[in-house]
Amino acid sequence: SKDIRLLEVGEIKKATTCKVYKHVIGGMLVQDRDVGTYEKFECVTKAQFPKNKEELARFTWLVTKHTKSNAIVMGYEYKPGYFQIMGLGPGQPNRIDSNLRLCQPRVRDNVARLPEAEGLDEAGLKALEQKVFAEVVMGSDAFFPFPDNVEAAHDAGVRYIVQPGGSKKDDLSIEKCDEFGIAMVFTGMRHFRH
């Protein structure tokens, strides 16, 4: 198929070091290599995370892990078993900017590029946008210290969130999810890519 690209790579070996070294002005940053993906997959909200969204959540979480912090990612299952990233918000000073300024606008742009968007008028595109936001899984590479990202997700129509948890204020985000009927999963493992 013309849509498949095969790449040949050398032998893939397991990482030999547990540390990552980054040169910065005036020194070097040494941090542990991020080798795990998640410690758990625990729904912490009243709204249960549907089984049919778990693979999409794992895909979105894996992409989120490899996205520069502070990362917000929205993954979408465009046909059964086939996933794509609709929006990605990397490298911002806070997650709300990653969400509102980068990720959500990219989702809206990409909705217009979906095959089912062809020939739709403005109202049809808006309806498709709402459908996509209702079906994406939103991932965050670290916990939410405030419920603002849950509120922003709800305002867009997002119903599923995956994040590590671990904030002293997790209960505020959980309460907002419960208020809005959003299902949220905690992975127990955060990922920072700086």
What are these language model-derived features?
Residues 1-194:
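ATP-dependent carboxylate/acyl-activation modules
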